[in-house]
Amino acid sequence: MKQFFALIAACVLAISPSFAQDAGDDFVEYGVGLAISPFGPSLNLTYNVDAKNSISAGFGFSPEVSAPDALLPDWDTPGGFSATGTSSWMGVFWRHRPLENDNFGVNLGMAAGQIENTLTAGIPFHEGEDPHTYQVSYTENPVMYFGLSYGLKPVKGLQVGVDVGVLSTGGASVEYTGHAEEMEEHEEEIELEMEDIRDNFAWTMLPNIQIGVSYGF
């Protein structure tokens, strides 16, 4: 979690110089942009209702990628787990800019899709065997989103922005996907490892940081 907040701070410092130049630009009704987040790249189409309110439709996906060890939790299970994941989603979001400085915004939204994670044990049950795996799936829809944003003003030209928030989900299902014969032999160990995954990985609230560029027209 410390790495997550450090990443947020670094992103804000890196992109903040690009905002000042837009202050005098004219309001526009439409924007199209690209963004990147832990859930993959996305295409975003925006309609600016007025200078204070925007509605966006987002479409995102991620091919199977490995999670950096630095972003994984401290596991209770000896050896821990490595993780890979895929995702696909679409959502509708409302951004409100309550302050005089239109860079600041509050985002509320609703999305539907799925997130599939495969966790591989660091230590197999038996020496010389392939390590066993678990499937962690978020498939309950819809999910809600709340975030705070900076940038991506509703003005003409290229804009840069960052959004930090959380996805509120119904939780994930955790399934053992290793060899069936090990289920009986190591039933107690498997239950303990699944409990570790539920407590430390399969959260109902998922943090998000999204960095995007958009062109207003």
Predicted regions and their residues:
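Outer-envelope beta-barrel architecture signal
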Residues: 21-32, 39-41, 49-55, 102-104, ...
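Short, positively charged, low-complexity/disordered linker segments
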Residues: 150-181
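Cleavable N-terminal export/targeting peptides
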Residues: 1-25, 201-202, 217
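Residues on the lipid-exposed face of transmembrane beta-strands in outer-membrane beta-barrel proteins
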Residues: 34, 43-47, 92-96, 108-110, ...
